[in-house]
Amino acid sequence: RFNRVALSIADDDERSIAEYLADEKFGSRFGDDYLLPMASAIWSTGTDSIASFPIRSLVTFFDNHGLLSLGNRPQWKSVEAGSQRYVNAIAAQLHRYHLAAPVESITRSEQAVILKAHGERYLFDEVVIATHSDQALRMLTDPSKHEQKILGSILYEENEAVLHTDASLMPRSRKAWASWNYHIADNTTNKATLTYNMNILQQHQSPEHLLVTLNASDQIDPARVLKVRKYHHPVFN
């Protein structure tokens, strides 16, 4: 029913996902076991928080990505060898680049933009900051009030990603294994908890499935952990 009626939502509908589901009398199982986990996985946000996300924005995203139809789904393609392939291609075109060189500060003057990293000062005509907004704000030594308001208005939350080979994080039935596998039971953290199957997503041919699990490290066998990384995603409030 949701797939059938979702596109009839008006462009000026300002209801949240939770308000829409209640108003349109969708059952709790539909919201708790499908729509909220799906949105939570897409935006890496806990189900409690994502319930406040605008229903209009969700429907637009679902429509653009072919998620409102069970048939005629789009055929997704990916770059062979993953992002490393195009990162290396871009790097090959660059004159100079610095790796593992965190920017300490960016100061604007009438003559140049002064960038400081590793204690060294670099002068540029212009600097493009391609980071999260809170990181950009911390770099600027003299942010304007407008920059402080815009860059400081977005909150971020930490998500822990673990690369591992512990198949116990996947569904019991092998037939139910998908590229994205959401963990619903016992999720009291209000964080997105799911496991990505990288063998499906990136066509890996490894003997054991390479899995990436968000925010459930306590459920993973430590002996099967390969890498732990922490990411920060915007809070959709």
Predicted regions located by residue number:
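Mid-domain catalytic core of redox enzymes
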Residues: 102-236
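Active-site/ligand-binding neighborhood in enzyme catalytic cores
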Residues: 2-107
